[in-house]
């Protein structure tokens, strides 16, 4: 037992210059954990509620002093004296204190900050690395980095509809080698963009945001960059997409995509064409978050060939994930801690996915900080996949550097997930 001595929150800035919540939890033995809460740009309608001030006189209404007050005035008095090793009890106490079904009274950003900082403090008190404290002795799988090297959609001011174009160095022998491969392709792409007279400016997640003619143009550029860096597409490095289709859904079952009005069925046919042309192993949010029938059709058509990831569809919520599993919708869940608001509920979603035969992908948000908790969580859960942006921008690199440290600490017991994370892909 190690009791909580103090809980303190403050307002800091994220990678977009937008306020977010940082929390410090100190235990009676002096152990201190700190956590900063991320925030998304394209957010699912069913995510837990992020409490903001709505005061247009400060930070354009995006301040988080109300969430900070929730921590310092309401949560802290309830948790002082609580056993930090009882993560489940701690999280449930905050959920009960909030009293809503989406954490809208205290704010999911307030509750999550305390949840993560408490776990960090407890790990220090136990003299364990965070990944080991959270996952136990079996935690040793280093995830495949899903590197977002071209940004479109809501993450960039360009005409490209698809939000993220990712490279996955699945053929590497270790995480450190996969990171090197990804960096080499990233820099190869930068040279190629400049030689083509295209912008090499960066989007929110560190990927390039050039003005391109089409989504296929982006994919072709990436394949060329992979080859020029000395790697083989489909063998060394494969591709993944985050479509973020809810961003261009205009009505149920209807989308505005590449300048045309199309139906769910037409969009599904488009994806089938991509699968036949490119080494794609994963497609995230290919349809609107409410298009369950479309998702069922999509999963029936291509679910045996590609990972179909639900982000806005599932929002790290076990109720929505359970519906998806029972309905045969998608086959993977994107896991974002701030979508649900506590560490316990996040791990519940990962566990449910595994039991249902679904994969899980640990993910950052477009508004990030130097906090590296998700890197530890990826190893703790042995999920085998992580999305944390391009190999650029300090808040993204922080997660990659933490994974390098974890791999070094694990030594010979470390295992890189590689191809094992994508058993459905048939192009090997």
From Swiss-Prot:
EC number(s)? Answer: 4.2.1.11
Q: Which PROSITE patterns match?
A: ENOLASE
> Per the annotation, how and in what number is the cofactor bound?
Binds a second Mg(2+) ion via substrate during catalysis.
Q: What is the enzyme's main class? A: lyase
List ligand-binding residues for (2R)-2-phosphoglycerate: 163, 336, 365-366, 387
Keywords from the UniProt entry: Cytoplasm, Glycolysis, Lyase, Magnesium, Metal-binding, Secreted
Q: Which GO terms describe its cellular component?
A: cell surface; extracellular region; phosphopyruvate hydratase complex
* InterPro entries, A to Z: Enolase (IPR000941), Enolase-like_C_sf (IPR036849), Enolase-like_N (IPR029017), Enolase_C (IPR020810), Enolase_CS (IPR020809), Enolase_N (IPR020811)
Pathway given for this chain reads: Carbohydrate degradation; glycolysis; pyruvate from D-glyceraldehyde 3-phosphate: step 4/5
- GO BP annotations, alphabetical order: glycolytic process
Q: Provide a Gene Ontology MF annotation, just one.
A: phosphopyruvate hydratase activity
Q: Report the subcellular localization.
A: Cytoplasm; Secreted; Cell surface
* One Pfam family hit: Enolase_C
Q: Which residues form the active site?
A: 205, 336
Q: Which reaction does it catalyse?
A: (2R)-2-phosphoglycerate = phosphoenolpyruvate + H2O
Q: What is its main location?
A: cytoplasm
Residues noted as binding Mg(2+) in the record, renumbered to the chain: 242, 284, 311
Cofactor(s) named in the record: Mg(2+)
The family line of this record is: Belongs to the enolase family.
Role noted for this protein: Catalyzes the reversible conversion of 2-phosphoglycerate (2-PG) into phosphoenolpyruvate (PEP). It is essential for the degradation of carbohydrates via glycolysis.
Kindly provide the name given to this protein in its UniProt entry: Enolase
The uppermost taxa in this organism's lineage are: Bacteria, Bacillati, Actinomycetota, Actinomycetes, Micrococcales
């Amino acid at each position: 037992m190690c009791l909580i001595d103090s809980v303190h929150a403050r307002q800091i800035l994220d990678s977009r210059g937008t306020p977010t919540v940082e929390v410090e939890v100190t235990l009676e033995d002096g152990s201190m954990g700190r956590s900063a809460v991320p925030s998304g740009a394209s957010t699912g309608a069913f995510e837990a509620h992020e409490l903001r001030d709505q005061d247009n006189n400060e930070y354009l209404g995006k301040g988080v002093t109300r969430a900070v007050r929730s921590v310092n005035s309401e949560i802290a008095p309830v948790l002082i004296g609580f056993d930090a090793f009882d993560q489940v009890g701690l999280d449930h106490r905050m959920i009960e204190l909030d009293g809503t079904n989406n954490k809208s009274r205290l704010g999911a950003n307030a509750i999550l900050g305390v949840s993560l900082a408490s776990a960090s403090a407890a790990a220090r008190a136990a003299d364990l690395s965070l990944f080991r404290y959270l996952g136990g002795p079996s935690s040793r799988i280093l995830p495949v980095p899903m590197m977002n090297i071209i940004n479109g959609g809501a993450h960039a001011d360009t005409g490209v509809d698809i939000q993220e174009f990712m490279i996955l160095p699945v053929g590497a022998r270790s995480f450190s080698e996969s990171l090197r491969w990804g960096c080499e392709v990233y820099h190869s792409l930068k040279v190629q963009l400049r030689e083509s007279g295209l912008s090499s400016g960066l989007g929110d997640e560190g990927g390039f945001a050039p003005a391109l003619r089409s989504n296929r143009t982006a994919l072709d550029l990436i394949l060329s960059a992979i080859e020029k860096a000395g790697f083989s597409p489909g063998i060394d490095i494969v591709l993944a997409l985050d479509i973020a289709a809810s961003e261009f859904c205009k009505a149920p079952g209807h989308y505005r995509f590449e300048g045309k009005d199309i139906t769910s069925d037409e969009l599904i046919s488009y994806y089938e064409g991509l699968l036949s042309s490119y080494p794609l192993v994963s497609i995230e949010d290919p349809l609107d978050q409410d298009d369950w029938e479309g998702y069922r059709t999509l999963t029936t058509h291509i679910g045996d060939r590609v990972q179909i990831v639900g982000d806005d569809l599932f929002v790290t919520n076990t109720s929505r994930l359970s519906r998806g599993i029972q309905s045969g919708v998608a086959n993977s869940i994107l896991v974002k801690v701030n979508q649900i608001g506590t560490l316990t509920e996040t791990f519940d979603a990962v566990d449910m996915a595994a039991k249902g035969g679904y994969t899980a992908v640990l993910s950052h948000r477009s508004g990030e900080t130097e906090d590296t908790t998700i890197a530890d969580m990826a190893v703790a859960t042995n999920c085998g996949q992580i999305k944390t942006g391009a190999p650029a921008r300090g808040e993204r690199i922080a997660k990659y550097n933490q994974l390098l440290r974890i791999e070094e600490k694990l030594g010979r017991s470390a295992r890189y997930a590689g191809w094992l994370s994508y058993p459905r892909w048939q192009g090997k």
